């Protein structure tokens, strides 16, 4: 596991909780009142869950592959993988779906592993464009398929609950590698399978 993904071990749980108390006071609240007494602990624990991706190496999920697939060499698509992330600019939630497709080159991976890769990158502070590229590049580097396609849909609460306050807006990003980028037919087949924004 990459050590660069590890949280700063010099920051203690106590320090994290005190930081939450500081923010509560800055917002105008009294962190010692009954309703907020356990809030610092709860927030610190929630952060441990929301940002657990920093303690994982996504590539490890793809290391176990299967080659006995009766020569299957057609498109594999996993769509509607739900995710929750947080934007690195305002620490506000990003909630959406990821669609992943790849054209295998002799080996495939369990579908739950693709979902775990998505979760590992999503459970970090993110920019949607970067997360899209990270997921695609991880699959390409480890599985070395003929091509990879990743499409990410996300509703950004930094836009819906602050600033311009525009609800119902969804951002869509994509990353195409290999034959998905070079062959319009492969790309079109993938996009037809996932039908982003359309009825299924």
Curated annotation (Swiss-Prot):
Binding site residues for Zn(2+): 87, 90, 158
EC number from the UniProt entry: 3.5.4.16
Gene3D superfamilies (UniProt xref): 1.10.286.10, 3.30.1130.10
Pathway membership, UniProt: Cofactor biosynthesis; 7,8-dihydroneopterin triphosphate biosynthesis; 7,8-dihydroneopterin triphosphate from GTP: step 1/1
Keywords, sorted A to Z: GTP-binding, Hydrolase, Metal-binding, Nucleotide-binding, One-carbon metabolism, Zinc
InterPro entries named among the record's database cross-references: GTP-CH-I_C/QueF (IPR043133), GTP-CH-I_N (IPR043134), GTP_CycHdrlase_I (IPR001474), GTP_CycHdrlase_I_CS (IPR018234), GTP_CycHdrlase_I_dom (IPR020602)
Molecular functions (GO terms): GTP binding; GTP cyclohydrolase I activity; zinc ion binding
GO terms under cellular component: cytoplasm
UniProt keyword annotation of Repeat present: no
NCBIfam families on file: folE, PRK09347.1-2, PRK09347.1-3
Family as reported in the entry's similarity comment: Belongs to the GTP cyclohydrolase I family.
Name of the protein in its database record: GTP cyclohydrolase 1
Organism: Xanthomonas euvesicatoria pv. vesicatoria (strain 85-10) (Xanthomonas campestris pv. vesicatoria)
């Amino acid at each position: 596991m990459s050590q660069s993904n590890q949280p700063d071990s010099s920051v203690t749980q106590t320090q994290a909780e005190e930081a939450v108390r500081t923010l509560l006071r800055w917002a105008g609240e009294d962190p010692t009142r009954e309703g907020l007494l356990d809030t610092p602990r709860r927030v610190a624990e929630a952060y441990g869950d929301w940002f657990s991706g920093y303690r994982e190496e996504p590539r490890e999920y793809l290391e176990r592959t299967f080659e006995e697939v009766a020569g299957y060499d057609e498109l594999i698509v996993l769509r509607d993988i739900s995710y929750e992330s947080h934007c690195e600019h305002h620490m506000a939630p990003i909630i959406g779906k990821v669609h992943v497709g790849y054209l295998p080159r002799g080996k495939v991976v369990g579908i739950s592993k693709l979902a775990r890769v998505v979760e590992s990158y999503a459970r970090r502070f993110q920019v949607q464009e970067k997360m899209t590229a990270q997921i695609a590049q991880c699959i390409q580097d480890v599985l070395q398929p003929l091509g990879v396609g990743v499409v990410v849909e996300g509703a950004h609460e930094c836009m819906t609950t602050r600033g311009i306050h525009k609800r119902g807006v969804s951002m869509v990003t994509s990353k195409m590698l290999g034959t998905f980028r070079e062959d319009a037919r492969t790309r079109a087949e993938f996009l037809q399978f996932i039908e982003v924004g359309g009825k299924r």
